[in-house]
């Protein structure tokens, strides 16, 4: 039987906590997956210094290639920055990608000076505050306070993320795989315009935009995470079944 696997991609300054509930929805169905740390993550904020979007894409692409040695088709699941990378991979590997789940993808930013950041980043060094309340912006604030995301990061790394959003947006019309776009109206990091831009510009005929109202940016762990994960699981199982049925008929 033809096999399908999933590549799970975390966000900017993020940790495995942000996406580690996804595998629990895959393993009962014997779905192989990869969940790599992208360059500069999972260690110290300073390790993002000098890292650019080219590194994040290269790491995700390496994991994609590794997974492809095990499976016939890949479903990409990405949160925030990981959503950008997932869309980029879908545009680059159209014949190998079965579907895309784009969760709160960082195609736009609430930060009103994001477009000016590239001018001041070299002078700013690290952004953020080690003492900031990590529960701010979460519906489930206690879970947010226990989250392991970086509290600060090198300003140039954010500038690279901002530039990456522009790069990926140009690639959206090349995406042909079915896509599920998930976003929260309460996201204080990425505005709803990001999800709307992806939905409007993506080349996929089979596309769905799913909204939530009791989640912050970290949708795979916040207040509505069970429902978000249900949607992810349903998308994966539906498209796996359809693919296996079509290949069986052949």
Set out the residue ranges of the language-model regions:
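The serine-hydrolase catalytic nucleophile loop
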Residues: 13-24
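Gly/Ala-rich beta-loop-alpha elbow adjacent to hydrolase catalytic centers
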Residues: 78-82, 86
């Amino acid at each position: 039987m033809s096999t399908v696997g999933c590549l799970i991609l975390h966000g900017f300054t993020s940790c495995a906590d942000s996406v580690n509930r996804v595998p629990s929805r895959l393993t009962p169905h014997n779905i192989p997956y990869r969940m790599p740390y992208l360059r500069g993550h999972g260690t110290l904020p300073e390790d993002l210094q000098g890292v650019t979007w080219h590194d994040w894409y290269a790491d995700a692409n390496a994991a994609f290639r590794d997974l492809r040695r095990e499976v016939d088709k890949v479903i990409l699941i990405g949160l925030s920055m990981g959503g950008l990378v997932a869309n980029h991979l879908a545009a680059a590997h159209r014949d190998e990608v079965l579907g895309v789940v784009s969760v709160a993808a960082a195609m736009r930013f609430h930060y009103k000076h994001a477009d000016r950041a590239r001018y001041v980043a070299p002078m700013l060094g690290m952004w953020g505050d080690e003492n900031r309340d990590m529960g701010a912006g979460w519906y489930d604030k206690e879970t947010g306070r226990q989250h392991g995301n970086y509290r600060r990061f090198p300003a140039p790394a954010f500038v690279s993320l901002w530039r990456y959003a522009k790069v990926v947006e140009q690639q959206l019309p090349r995406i042909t795989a079915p896509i599920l776009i998930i976003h929260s109206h309460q996201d204080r990091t990425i505005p709803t315009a990001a999800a709307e831009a992806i939905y409007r510009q993506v080349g996929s005929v089979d596309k769905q935009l799913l909204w939530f109202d009791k989640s912050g940016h970290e949708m795979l762990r916040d207040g509505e995470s069970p429902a978000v994960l249900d949607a992810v699981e349903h998308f994966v199982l539906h498209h796996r079944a359809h693919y296996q049925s079509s290949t069986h008929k052949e």
